[in-house]
Amino acid sequence: RETGVEISSFIVVYRWSGPTEEQRKMAVENWKKMIEIAVDMNVPVINTEFSGDPNQQEICNGMWFRSMEELLPIIEKEGLRVEVQSHPYDFCELNNEACDLVKSFRSPNLGYVYSSPHGFFYDEGKGDVRSMLKYAGDELTHVLFADTFNQTLDCRYIANPPWLNQRGKSDVTIHQHLAMGEGDVDFDGIFE
């Protein structure tokens, strides 16, 4: 404060979607402390992710709602805005479903972040940024810019060893953040 420098936002990632109740409760306590810190430091925005486990979507979805029901009244009371993005390997990776989760609370204190390097996860490899941003509508509060390759196309990324998961299936997500223009993201569509 003495220097005049202000912080525009924090970014935190807690396991508020579980998949275990112990993880969720611990995350909610961490969230409460982070909210206190944001208020004390006059930081109006906290960016975050859904977290959870894509292999336990139903459980994690319920845990996220339980966490939000506990935290959103505090967030609203303190006048903060929480902006949520879907991240690869979260319980919810799809754009429209993520937007629906945010929209379901009908709160101006809860917004949706579109992260362009995650866009191919958001619509299962189509990369149709125009329709995703249109669907987000008024809940869209923030866009993160970086390029990436479409991970669904053949030979874009190689993950070794092939047995990365003992359950006998691929349980790995791969993406990267590149400079704009170095990958497959439709930036013209974003800027329209």
Q: Can you name each region flagged by the protein language model?
A:
Residues 3-9, 15-114, 121:
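Active-site acidic/histidine proton-transfer and metal-coordination neighborhood
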